[in-house]
From Swiss-Prot:
GO molecular function: homoserine O-acetyltransferase activity; homoserine O-succinyltransferase activity
EC category: transferase
Name listed for the protein in its UniProt record: Homoserine O-succinyltransferase
Site feature (Important for acyl-CoA specificity) residues: R332
Catalytic function, reaction form: L-homoserine + succinyl-CoA = O-succinyl-L-homoserine + CoA
Oligomeric and partner information: Homodimer.
Role played: Transfers a succinyl group from succinyl-CoA to L-homoserine, forming succinyl-L-homoserine.
Length: 390
């Protein structure tokens, strides 16, 4: 929820910021049926909102997060003035997703480590953290949980459900699981399923965690340690896939950390230093069990599987209008993966707009400032606002 006064240490809140925000914790006592056949009961979801829900409850937009993000989509966290929302350049007054017009909701998914119930939470059956006992969750499970959040707000239909990367998969799942509950589906830098190569990257990352001596079968909390070495390597692997070769060449090239080579196995190149820094930073704040869960959810997502692998048949049940966006240098989820979604929609004669943005920053481009990209998003949301009278 948005406050009006800046927190201590923040002298100036930008006029296009949603301001200082404090999340709310929603508790759900009714069991949630999971895709794996089990249930989870008495769980919490962290939720953050921006803007005002109109009387008709038609101006709500759900923003779904990617692997290491959370409910904190925009604004300044009340408990940490340096914590700016992960999509702050997209969401706010006068921004592409304009909170003067739309009521924006961010939900932290089950299994995460940012306040929603996950492996770090207390298992009511044991009184200890769930750890490895936390059930494997899927994109579909997250969407079902998000639908319960919508119910609490009295939202029958979202003006849009939007996400990038893994968030885009959730948006896509919304269009299939609750086709009548969203007017528009915005899928950015995403894919209808992971390729074998992407599953392989995830497996190497998970293996680095599982082989860390401090992992203790996922119950490292009881040992008061974290498998930081494995998590560090996992993040380094993932980070490489988020950047383009062009971007890495421009940022680092073959620049050395010292003036000359030292003929050692310590850090020699600037790119090595960068990756180690990113890995170290990630290992300090992220949870290894959560990393395992979320990467496995990525692997499992494949809406065409129930339709004999035919994405066109899978997409036949959609009712929303679509905006699909890809980036030329994204090799994690390359443009051809977005075009698969577009083709399936066109085959079903569904309304879809598609843009392939020429950007040098690889997969991470969906999070960065780019005038063409943001103008496109702004224009699409202007259209939605006109439809609903926002």
């Amino acid at each position: 929820m948005t406050d009006v006064a800046p927190p201590a240490g923040v002298l100036d809140v930008p006029t296009d910021s949603v301001g200082v925000v404090t999340p709310q914790r929603m508790h759900f006592s009714e069991p949630l049926q999971l895709r794996n056949g089990s249930q989870i009961a008495d769980y919490d979801l962290m939720v953050e909102t921006y803007g005002t829900l109109n009387a008709a409850r038609t101006n709500a937009v759900l923003v779904c997060h990617a692997l290491n993000a959370s409910h904190h989509v925009a604004g300044i966290a009340a408990d940490n003035p340096r914590d700016i929302g992960w999509w702050d350049n997209m969401v706010g007054p006068g921004k592409p997703l304009d909170t003067n017009r739309f009521f924006v909701i961010g939900v932290n998914n089950l299994g995460s480590c940012f306040g929603s119930t996950g492996p770090m939470s207390t298992n009511p059956s044991t009184g200890a953290p769930y750890g490895a006992l936390f059930p494997v969750v899927t994109v579909e499970d997250w969407v079902n949980a998000q639908a319960r959040v919508a119910d609490i707000f009295g939202i029958q239909q979202f003006a849009a459900v939007m996400g990038g990367s893994l968030g885009g998969m959730q948006a896509l799942a919304w269009s299939l699981m609750y086709p009548e509950r969203l007017r528009h589906c915005i899928v950015v830098a995403s894919t209808p399923k992971l390729s074998a190569q992407n599953i392989a990257f995830n497996e190497v990352a998970r293996s680095s965690i599982l082989s860390d001596p401090d992992f203790h079968g996922g119950n490292y909390y009881a040992h008061n340690v974290k498998p930081k070495r494995g998590l560090r390597v996992a993040r380094m692997i993932g980070h490489i896939t988020y950047l383009s070769d062009e971007d890495m060449a421009e940022k680092f090239g073959r620049s050395l950390k010292a003036e000359d080579i030292r003929f050692s196995f310590d850090v020699e190149f600037q790119v090595e230093s960068y990756l180690r820094y990113q890995g170290d930073k990630f290992a300090e704040y992220f949870d290894a069990n959560t990393y395992l869960l979320i990467t496995r959810a990525l692997d499992y997502f494949d809406p065409a599987l129930a339709h004999g692998g035919d994405l066109t048949r899978a997409m036949a049940q959609t009712q929303a209008g679509f905006l699909v966006v890809s980036f030329t240098t994204d090799w994690r989820f390359a443009p051809n993966r977005s075009r698969e979604i577009v083709k399936a929609l066109l085959d079903n004669k569904r309304p879809v707009s598609y843009a392939e943005i020429d950007a040098p920053h690889g997969h991470d481009a969906f999070l960065l400032d780019d005038a063409r990209y943001h103008n496109l998003m702004r224009a699409y949301y202007d259209r939605i606002a006109e439809e609903i009278g926002a």
